[in-house]
A protein has these predicted regions:
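Solvent-exposed alpha-helices and their adjacent loops that cap or buttress functional pockets
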Residues: 10, 27-30, 49-54, 64-66, ...
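A structural signal for short hydrophobic beta-strand segments in well-ordered beta-sheet cores
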Residues: 35-37
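Alpha-helical interface subdomain recognition
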Residues: 9, 13, 41, 120-210
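Residue-level signal for inorganic ion chemistry
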Residues: 60, 72, 98, 137, ...
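A short core secondary-structure module
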Residues: 45-81, 95
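Flexible, small-/acidic-enriched active-site or ligand-binding loops
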Residues: 28, 32, 48-49, 75-110
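A short, Trp-centered hydrophobic/proline-enriched beta-strand micro-motif
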Residues: 13-24, 60
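Internal helix-loop-helix
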Residues: 1-8, 13, 50-57, 189
């Protein structure tokens, strides 16, 4: 089964997986999807794909034509898949464009999932990424504060200058706001609140701004 084949490698880190959903700028919806699966043949393009430059397998969203999407599993190390690296601000994720030219693919599990259920998965991912970004922002603030105390200019630590204090204070406020929204997003997921989509989006945006 797919679980027996892929989960051990994913758990050990030997296999890298990614989600290939976006198809360019703007929001990708069930109606706007153009990637299609015919039998076991996948055609279309996805961009940007986080970790697309390094991943071994991808879960690709394709149109089902009835308000649903079909999730298919694709091995990326095949000649019918073309990877084109994309330069982004996050060099750790190796973003890429993935082009599928009748690539061999198979439905993931039952294959078809209703769009509302897929949106729920995206909300969960948004909250998860919000916490990851908040952790990075917290570390950046910590390092900035340390540097401001260690670096001297005009005979005193630069952290004693009002402009630097205001900058660090602004960073702290943004981090605190992002943390509050991330907690709210986690609560909305755990309680299956009707506000989940808004809470997840708010957590994502606040963490980006932190």
């Amino acid at each position: 089964s797919q679980k027996q084949r892929w989960l051990p490698g994913l758990a050990s880190g030997e296999t890298i997986a990614t989600l290939a959903h976006a198809e360019g700028a703007g929001q990708t919806t069930a109606k706007s999807l153009t990637a299609s699966l015919s039998g076991d043949s996948l055609t279309g393009a996805k961009k940007p794909v986080a970790d697309g430059a390094a991943a071994n397998i991808a879960i690709v969203t394709t149109t089902a034509g009835d308000g649903s999407v079909t999730l298919c599993l694709v091995e990326l190390d095949q000649g019918t898949v073309v990877r084109t690296p994309i330069q982004t601000l996050d060099f750790s994720r190796g973003h890429a464009t993935l082009e599928f030219n009748n690539a061999s693919a198979e439905p993931l599990g039952n294959g078809t999932i209703h769009w509302s259920s897929f949106e729920s998965l995206l909300d969960r991912a948004a909250v998860l990424m919000a916490w990851e970004q908040l952790g990075i922002a917290d570390k950046a603030l910590e390092q900035a504060c340390d540097y401001a105390q260690q670096r001297y200019a005009f005979g005193r630590a630069i952290g004693s200058f009002q402009a630097i204090k205001h900058k660090l204070a602004g960073m702290y406020v943004k981090n605190a706001l992002a943390r509050s929204n991330a907690y709210h997003g986690a609560w909305a997921l755990a309680s299956d609140s009707d506000t989940r989509p808004l809470a997840a989006s708010t957590a994502r945006v606040a963490s980006i701004q932190a």
